[in-house]
Swiss-Prot record:
Tissue: Spermatophore.
Function noted in UniProt: Structural protein of a layer within the wall of the spermatophore produced probably by cell type 4 of the bean-shaped gland (BAG). Fixation in the spermatophore seems to require covalent cross-linking of spermatophorins.
Species annotation: Tenebrio molitor (Yellow mealworm beetle)
Listed Pro residues bias regions: 109-128
Protein name, entry field: Spermatophorin SP23
Length: 182
């Protein structure tokens, strides 16, 4: 019994958890403003309330047909005994209409110039090694040295003891003394 009751209650609990908007993204509902509440636009009215930027020039007055005078058919015209709706409604919507504001200029340095990517230059072509022509070494011509004729040298042989100097060179006549004690 308990198992059957628990088994019957489980599908009911699952149905209660699964709401129709369970799989829809959460969107909060904005209630329409009551009297005296500040109106903030844009206001997401789900029931199709007129937008605050509606052009009141195009709204035709009820129970009036088209006339030859275009000003009489517009909301900006002043009726007999009354004032135009535009004079009251337009300023209210202008309070909440976003106005263009001057941009806040801060003393900043000028932005750096954009970096333009420049591809590196291509590498230089490999050097072409040209074989130099073989150097021909020319042997110099042999120089012939001609020896001048030497003057005749007379050798004088003495049998005397060696003096203080062994060789005596004389210029004219050129003589060479050779001793036996050498």
């Amino acid at each position: 019994m308990v198992a059957s009751i628990a088994g019957e209650e489980e599908p009911a609990a699952e149905k209660s958890q699964q709401s129709p908007d369970h799989f829809q993204p959460y969107r909060p509902y904005y209630y329409p403003p009551y009297r005296g509440y500040p109106i903030t636009y844009p206001y997401p009215y789900p029931h199709g309330y007129p937008k605050p930027y509606h052009n009141f020039q195009t709204i035709a007055k009820p129970n009036e047909g088209p006339t030859d005078q275009p000003e009489a058919n517009s909301a900006n015209s002043i009726e007999e005994g009354g004032v135009s709706k535009r004079l009251f409604i337009e300023p209210i919507f202008n309070l909440f209409r976003p106005r263009p504001r001057d941009p806040i200029v801060v003393n900043q340095a000028p932005p750096p110039p954009p970096v333009i990517y420049q591809a590196p230059p291509p590498p230089p072509p490999p050097p072409i090694f040209q074989q130099a022509p073989p150097t021909i070494y020319q042997q110099p011509s042999p120089t012939i040295i001609q020896q001048a004729p030497q003057p005749s040298v007379t050798k004088l042989v003495y049998s005397q003891p060696e003096p203080s100097h062994s060789v005596i060179y004389q210029t004219q006549p050129k003589t060479e003394l050779v001793y036996l004690n050498q």
